[in-house]
Amino acid sequence: MLELKQVGKVYQREQQTFTALSDISLKIEAGEIYGIIGYSGAGKSTLIRLLNGLEKPTSGDVLVNGQSIVGLSEQAMRPIRQKIGMIFQHFNLLWSKTILENIALPLKLAGVGKKERLAKAKEMLALVELTDLGAAYPSELSGGQKQRVAIARALISEPAILLCDEATSALDPKTTNSILSLLAKINQEMGITIVLVTHEMDAVRRICQRIAVMAAGRVIEEGTTQAIFETPQAEVTKAFVSESLVITPSETAASIEQLLTRVPEGTIIKLRFNEEQSSQPVIGQLMRRYPSVEVSVISGSLQQTINGALGYLYIQIQASPDDLKQALSDLSQQTIEVEVLRHG
């Protein structure tokens, strides 16, 4: 559906060159929700502009449905762009037009008759659950409602692809969740490929099947949502995952130090587990099996991803050397990832 092959993008600015993207290779399958995450300046927005042909790469190739769009003229790009919808952080609505007129605008520009385009706009209003607001104006709507209007407008031309550039960044958490649920519903009911570009790990965790992590113009890690959260490799990815799981490194370190002031003995361990393991009484089993084992919970978190639950648990174990060794072995045999952070 969408593919980038060794794409690079370099800008020339006042006798200086700025490399926005370097050697980007991605393949986004038809019908999936694909997340692209990175901090500001990572190159996310440049990448999304390459996907819809608003920018041309300096090197490499961009393919839409197997067709290279790099060398196409503006005229040749028009029918391709009609199948690519896009929403932004800012809603870009026309304040002097009603909500129905805003949604119908792409069809008006395409020469579709008034009766037909307004009928289609009403269908889109129903899809985004704003049926009663067709006669309202943008100034009367909340931020979440405005983004729903922007989504309806992007979908009215029946695109096969929806590009979302920081679409939830200006919204509060509750509204963000409602927009993400709407995008998931659209993907499921209409089969539209969605590319979600964001700096919010919680957003990609909730609805994306796969994720690419960007930093300094490169893709530094890519994989399924489950794999990225369970075993992040790059430091940037680990930071994103920690933020999403509400276990920041500084908070964890502070909790560990606080515990060690009270109980200086013991081994500090980080456990990482998935949905199946989260339902097992792991700690209770350890304490029953090894009478000398005492466990203190430092901090933990369990979150849902589209592929299932995953979580972290930081614990302190006090035990005899033999029991500790055997307990760690038992945990590992249950496919729980065990990381010893500090020996007692």
Curated annotation (Swiss-Prot):
Its EC number is 7.4.2.11. Belongs to the ABC transporter superfamily. Methionine importer (TC 3.A.1.24) family. It catalyses: L-methionine(out) + ATP + H2O = L-methionine(in) + ADP + phosphate + H(+); D-methionine(out) + ATP + H2O = D-methionine(in) + ADP + phosphate + H(+). The keyword Cell membrane applies. Its main location: membrane. Part of the ABC transporter complex MetNIQ involved in methionine import. Responsible for energy coupling to the transport system. This is Methionine import ATP-binding protein MetN. Pfam families: ABC_tran (PF00005), NIL (PF09383). Residues 2-241 form the ABC transporter domain. One of its GO terms (cellular component) is plasma membrane. Signal peptide: none annotated. Keywords: Amino-acid transport, ATP-binding, Cell membrane, Membrane, Nucleotide-binding, Translocase, Transport. It comes from Latilactobacillus sakei subsp. sakei (strain 23K). It is found in: Cell membrane. It is an enzyme of class 7 (translocase). The complex is composed of two ATP-binding proteins (MetN), two transmembrane proteins (MetI) and a solute-binding protein (MetQ). GO terms for molecular function: ABC-type D-methionine transporter activity; ATP binding; ATP hydrolysis activity. Gene3D superfamilies: 3.30.70.260, P-loop containing nucleotide triphosphate hydrolases. SUPFAM superfamilies: ACT-like, P-loop containing nucleoside triphosphate hydrolases. ATP binds at residues 38-45. The keyword Ion transport does not apply. It is a peripheral membrane protein.
